[in-house]
């Protein structure tokens, strides 16, 4: 989900330039973007089925839900102010827009990876300890990199015990198909292909660190502050779709499967390793748990160690983060990432 450190540096520099003179205001039309991933497919169907139009109309606004083909590029465009909202993981929200000075609110924490990300090694019966001394192929500075480090920690190893080889998510499947590559870290759908390779072992997966790789819809904080209708419409549309999915609505699920390039069985297999919050009450329990702040502190530490919090970062606490209950971590004078439960509360209370 990340490209090179140079590209990241350029993106953060651009974000600082773009964000300084930008002032949000009340407006009537908004643009949000999403990319293909099991937990974000609902956004495409929310758009194509006109559910978003219904909710936007309720609040007197228009919301354009735009699919982009490149995940990192979608975040870059959001960070540069070209979109009001965007789907991204918790780590990427911290290290790209927030680190770039763009005050960002996690509006909907829709799901977390519960096996959609994994470390796969060639050979049967392998374990995490077998990684010692190996080359590990993965998209460097991504959630895959984070997952590897978490796995190594659990095995009593450290990143210095392996050699990380930067490999794009687009190339990871073909790389694993070569004899020289013995270990790869990937996310679905690439992970399912790699796991399908004969004589392999998944030695670690995101199911062993539940709730740490979170799939979110974020929005610009100032835009949301000036336009709460945007938050209400997005949240209302999302939970209407969650209701359809929970009820196994064939039309909705088939549309998502087709858009993701698979059939219904294939998409449902991906959903099995995606912990979707089908009700706002379930989401509330997750968002208000003290574990969320602990997870983000861990993510911030990893990000600081990798130099992902920007050149001015002197510690993992450089970026301030706010959580429900007015809980804060990091620098309160540099508050750039906020986890807001107010709109989910409205959904739970039926007041949207």
Q: Where would I find each of the regions flagged by the language model?
A:
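Bacterial N-terminal signal peptides that target proteins for export
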Residues: 1-11
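Pocket-lining segment of extracytoplasmic ligand-binding domains
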Residues: 92, 165, 171-265
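Sec/Tat-exported extracytoplasmic proteins
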Residues: 56, 82, 87-90, 97-100, ...
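Secondary-structure end/capping motifs
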Residues: 226-312
């Amino acid at each position: 989900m990340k490209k090179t450190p140079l590209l990241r540096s350029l993106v953060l520099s651009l974000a600082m330039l773009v964000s300084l003179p930008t002032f949000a205001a009340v407006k009537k039309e908004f643009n949000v973007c999403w990319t293909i991933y099991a937990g974000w497919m609902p956004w495409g169907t929310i758009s194509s089925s006109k559910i978003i139009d219904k909710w936007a109309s309720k609040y007197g606004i228009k919301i354009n839900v735009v699919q982009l083909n490149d995940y990192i590029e979608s975040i870059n465009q959001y960070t540069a102010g070209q979109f009001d909202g965007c789907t991204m993981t918790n780590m990427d929200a911290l290290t790209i827009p927030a680190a770039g000075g763009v005050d960002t609110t996690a509006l909907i924490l829709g799901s977390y990876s519960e096996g959609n990300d994994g470390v796969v090694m060639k050979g049967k019966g392998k374990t995490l300890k077998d990684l010692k001394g190996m080359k590990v192929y993965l998209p460097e500075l991504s959630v895959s990199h984070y997952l590897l480090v978490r796995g190594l920690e659990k095995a009593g190893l450290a990143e210095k015990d392996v050699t990380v080889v930067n490999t794009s998510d687009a190339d990871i499947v073909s790389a694993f198909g070569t004899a020289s590559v013995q270990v790869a870290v990937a996310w679905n759908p690439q992970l399912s292909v790699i796991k399908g390779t004969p004589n392999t072992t998944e030695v670690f997966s995101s199911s062993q660190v539940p709730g740490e790789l979170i799939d979110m819809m974020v929005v610009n904080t100032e835009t949301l502050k000036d336009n709460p209708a945007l938050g209400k419409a997005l949240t209302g549309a999302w939970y209407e779709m969650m209701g359809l999915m929970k009820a196994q609505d064939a039309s909705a699920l088939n549309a998502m499967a087709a858009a993701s390039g698979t059939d219904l069985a294939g998409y449902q297999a991906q959903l099995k390793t995606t912990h979707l919050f089908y009700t706002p009450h379930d989401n509330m329990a997750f968002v208000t748990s003290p574990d969320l702040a602990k997870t983000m502190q861990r993510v911030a530490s990893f990000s600081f160690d990798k130099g992902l919090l920007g050149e001015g970062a002197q510690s993992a606490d450089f970026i301030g983060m706010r959580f429900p209950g007015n809980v804060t971590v990091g620098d309160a004078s540099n508050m750039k990432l906020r986890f807001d439960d107010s709109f989910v509360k409205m959904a739970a209370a039926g007041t949207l």
